[in-house]
Every structure is written in C-alpha cells, then in structure tokens.
Amino acid sequence: MYLFRKFQQERNMKNTLTAVFVLLLFLCACKYKTTDEGSIIYHIEYQLPDSLKRYVKYLPKVATVYFKGDSTVSIQKSNQESTTIITDKKTNFMRVLLNSAFRQYVVDYNKADQAEEIGTLPPHTTTKQKDIKTIAGYQAAKYVLQDKLSGETTEAWFTKDISILPNSLTMVLDSTLGVPLAFTISQNVMKMKVTVQQVKFGPVPAAVFSTPKGYKLLTPQQLREMPVQN
C-alpha cells in the first residue's frame, strides 16, 4: 500500500509539473507574440483651403495598412479611385498604384521624390506633455510639435506598448517616440488628421505586396505633368 501511494504521489507530481510547463510555454508565446506582421486601420480627416473644400467628399476617409518584415502597403479607397503605396524600408523602395475605372498607373519613387508624395513636416520642435490617453487599446503619450517658422502647433500621440514598422502615412514622424496613433501631416495644399482605429497582428495576404498586371508605368514627373482629366 505504501509503495502504491508513493507511486500515485509521484505520478500526480509529474502531471502537475507537466501542466505547469505547458502553461509557461503558453504564457511565453503570448508575451513574446511577434509584431512584425499584421494590419492597421486609420481614420482620416482633411483640412482644405476654402476654394477646395467641395472636393473633400471625394477623398478617402479610411486607410488600411498591411505590414510584414521590412515591407508595408497602404491602401486608400474612395468612391471612384484607389491609391496603393508599397514601401520597403531596407531598399528605400516606394511604388504607388493608381487605380480607377479609366486608368491604372504604377509609379516608382526614389528617395528624393518620396517626400512630395507622402507629405512632410516643416522644421519643428517636439515637446512631450504629461497627457496620457488610450487609442485603439494602447496607452499613448501626447507630444506638441511646433513649427519653427510659423509658430503653429499640432499634437501627436505615440505609444511604446508595441513596435511597428513605419508606413507611408507615418514615415515622416520620429519613430524613436514610438508608434504614432494620432497625428496631423501636411500634403501639398491640405492637412490630414490621422487616427488609428484598429491594430491587428497576424498573417497578411501575400498578394497585397504585388503589382497586378495591366498597369502602365509612369515616372513621377510624367504623373505630375498629366492633365487632370486623364
């Protein structure tokens, strides 16, 4: 009887240790979940000059970004057109796909041409504030960006809870501050207020990084010189 009870105790101990080991593996897998592949959904608001405000209804209000490794792809769709921007951080590659019912163009941008396409920030100072709020489920810290020339200020919110590769919407911002969850950037004659609505980690469709057949290749200069009606 003694030997039988001792055998049972040892077996129970082994079962307990096995269960603890499996639980630890599960917790480690959750804690160290990869963040190099997934998607982000952004909400976009526009500030246009009075003479152009009538066009705001044609602009995309949502951007979906997929990221994997060194690559990102940003997709913005309106009622009549879609713009897809593919980037690769390692090679400084950027490709823009323009698609509508009447045209399909592909434009490759070198590093020097990219600023005009993705927008810029003027020379500015960045000051961290004490404000903290939750955006898309992540704790974000507030920063005030002040234009050195005009004195105009805008705010941006960054989180360090996660680490995500910059994409065409965020690459003008200082990545050392964290992942931007809400910010304003200037693009040509308009300003874009961008806010993250959702972040998801997991496999992304491989096809989103490819260029469909049938797109006509243009240079950035050819695109700029193209009449609007085309």
Cite the ranges covered by each PLM segment.
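Bacterial Sec-dependent N-terminal signal peptides
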Residues: 1-40
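Extended soluble regions of mature proteins
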Residues: 30-110, 114-230
